[in-house]
Amino acid sequence: MATITLPMVPTNEQQELLVQTLAGIRSVLDEQGAELIGGHTMESRSASPLPASLGVQITLAVNGRSSQSPWLKSGLQPGDALLISRPLGTGVLFAGAMTGATKATDLDAALKGMACSQHTLLEQLEPVRGDIHACTDITGFGLLGHLGEMLQNRTGLKILLDGAAIPAYSGALDLFERGISSTLAPSNRAAWRWLDNTVQLRQPPSAALLELLVDPQTCGPLLLACNSKAAAQLTQNGPWLRIGNATTG
């Protein structure tokens, strides 16, 4: 279901905006085998921006059904490998873009990656479904925040991270080194408490790496925990990268 709010412009312009907006929505849904079954159209009471396309507001209500049990965050097991599907750093790149500090080429590269749907990765995961014990997507809480969620109520488990293996979008670490960070970063830094004992880094972390661990993500990567056999298979052809493992003691 789609709710589309159009700007206050002449009717013919509204019709064209609606047609183009619906075409854009369908282009994404069709690729993933989803259907647009209906919706509502409204008109904004605010002044129309220029260009008028900036005044289009879209809300989608998405429902799905699966014949199989979903992967949860809570299934982490000793010996599991931790894999990530794409780089981190969108939060700081957007923060830098607001002040002109982010290079245009770096921002374009990140946007290109963010625009790629990850639904095709699910097809890649299907052959090893039974070997995957936990899965989530990294959002505004950052990598470390989601690792903390995986560890909740998992007494005796620890995570050993390879900081050098954690991927970052081009330009992200440089921005951290210049003191730039997202507005959500200060609250996310509370997750650094996990580094006291439960989450350990193989190498002493740089200040930039510490910031990357809590950088809030938009269109962030998938993070999964699986056994070593599945990890070897998934990392062989990409895009999966192994960033650590779960251990005991």
Regions found by a protein language model. Give the residues of each.
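Short acidic/polar alpha-helix capping motifs at helix-coil junctions
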Residues: 87, 107-113, 194-200
